């Protein structure tokens, strides 16, 4: 009996001790009850915001509302032709560039870009006057329409393209644009068109560097936007350049110099005999011998060519008809 009483008494003491010291929460850190952290219930939900400190508050003042600001990027003429100068004189935006670049940047090319945008215009010599268009004023409030004037001026050393606003109307009411508006309108047109001519120049130069496309070329004698007779071709610039280079010598034109990127050739003409023209199926054109030039204009996958005399005047009349028919017969083979 003594052997059984001792273990039972010890077990009773352990059980009693364990029941007397039961904690209301688990304590797995073996801390003493007095040192264990206690938790309290949050009385209010969320975060308590401290009030604003008015120490540095600015005094209230009556501030007058200013005029609405035009946050659009400023439009100024940009000199994006090599060795050029661009400016706005208060009425006109212009870009002045070396005369040797006039075969790329000229009134004919400006007319072509207007045609591509379906902007109607009239032309006389080196001046263009457009019909009403919202070009350059699409972001204005209301319906703003403008009529532009584009001029090409120059001498042996330099040329310039000049853009001005002839008339302006907003919601069918004529108004006089402010100087800032004139600068924005004229600069937008000038920068956009010159930028596109730059892109055309680069694409033509790149096209000539690639292998020539072969295949038949369809042709037609047309009147271009400058009222000049021209030969239209169903071929891209590269193929037209190559075809014309082969055909022109057969008509008596010798190439003195050429600028591929501009689509320009300077030519010297010596008339062929009547027999040679008869073989081409046309009558001999009444053209004087001397200096001429050839200018290709690219129109996407099509192109056109104009031949001009040494004064820059496009050949016309029966002489132009005969010359372009002969060219068409040669390049369509």
UniProtKB/Swiss-Prot annotation:
PROSITE patterns named in the record: PROKAR_LIPOPROTEIN (PS51257)
Protein's job: Part of the outer membrane protein assembly complex, which is involved in assembly and insertion of beta-barrel proteins into the outer membrane.
Lipid-acceptor residues (N-palmitoyl cysteine): 19
Self-association and partners: Part of the Bam complex.
Subcellular localization, as worded in the UniProt entry: Cell outer membrane
Lipidated sites in chain (S-diacylglycerol cysteine): 19
Signal sequence bounds: 1-18
Identification of the protein by name: Outer membrane protein assembly factor BamC
GO cellular component: cell outer membrane
Biological processes, Gene Ontology terms: Gram-negative-bacterium-type cell outer membrane assembly; protein insertion into membrane
Keywords: Cell outer membrane, Lipoprotein, Membrane, Palmitate, Signal
Principal cellular location given in the protein's record: membrane
Topology within the bilayer: Lipid-anchor
Protein family: Belongs to the BamC family.
InterPro entries assigned: BamC, BamC_C, NlpB/DapX
